[in-house]
Amino acid sequence: MGDEHSHHKIHSDFLKRTIENLGFNVIEVEHDQRVNIKNNLNIRILAADNCDPELCLKYFGCGIAEKTFGSTTIDTLSAIDNGEQVIINTNDCPISIAETSALKLKNHYKKINFLLFGYSSATAYPQCFHLNSDELQNSQQEIVKNFLSQGELYINLFNPNFFMPFAGRYVLGGKKFILEKHRAEIELEDALEYYLN
């Protein structure tokens, strides 16, 4: 086997098997448990929804699978630390879902040195939906506005020394290239300028 990969323990072992098939040794991390990876390098991973049935939409509570095997969510926040410096990654975690988990992370660490957060959408909406030009433009603007606002909320919550918007660039190519111009996107430089002002 090759390098190690850590991920939040989830009920389905599909993710674990897939990563192992790529040649990695997998370390499954229990929700909100700090795990030593090597020397003084540690990781803590939390399910974005903190296993809240109102957020994960399991209104009747967790089933036997979640209680026995852990979370079934795949969206996670993580903290990587060496005992002195802390990096927080919130990518793919809408703050409306992840606020409780984010607050838990904040309470675990006195100071956040570096914050990573997404600045753009990678979903099928709006480019894969039949919208008129006004609906498309309004949707694009609303999505960009929401992502910028979400990043701002994370910056204000964690108050890091440094931050980096990331994970917002991709290209629709091949047969779907025609949809590229309909994506809700903002250039990284424009997002950074927004956060610096």
Regions found by a protein language model. Give the residues of each.
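Short secondary-structure boundary micro-motifs
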Residues: 17-20, 61-65, 70-71, 139, ...
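Core dinuclear metal-dependent hydrolase active-site scaffold
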Residues: 30-111, 116-124
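Short low-complexity, flexible loop/linker segments enriched in glycine and/or proline
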Residues: 16, 44, 178-180
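Short, charged, low-hydrophobicity "junction" segments
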Residues: 11-29, 84-103, 133-142
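Active-site HxH/HxHxD metal-binding segment of metal-dependent hydrolases
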Residues: 1-35, 47-56
